[in-house]
Amino acid sequence: MVIERDILDILESIPDPEMPISILDLGLIEEVEIQDSSVHVTVLPTFVGCIALPVIADEIKLKVGELEDVEAVEVQFIYDPPWSTDRITNKGKADLATHGITVPDGTSCGCTSHAIGVDLRITAIACPWCESNETTLTSPFGPTRCRSIHFCNSCRQPFERMKKV
């Protein structure tokens, strides 16, 4: 018999193709439904048009499909409710920080440029390497649509920040 905890453990082992954490810790999993030998996984993409969606779907189908008693796996992407950085688990935030990626704390004043999704707050962003607030935005565009590039003037290291969504 298939149980939800087994599926969640598998989802926690699947890395996001663009971020150094699991799809579960990134908060992409909205719901897991089990009916007999079929599993339905509902996923919230970080952005509409995310190019990693086919890879995520294939990995979920492959890994969950390897469970004993699972005969069918369906993956559905939904956009309502929208994904936000508030869905990232504390473990996910810690894992991202070890890779030099910071996450908005959810206390933003709401001052964002909706055209590019960049936080325009005046307050400094702490460096994930040395925790200094002496940081600057280098580019609102990072390696993926959901990240921006920053620089720490104290330790002289670049770092990325997830955009508040």
Labelled PLM ranges:
Residues 1-165:
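Domain-level signature for proteins that mediate thiol-based redox and metal-cofactor handling
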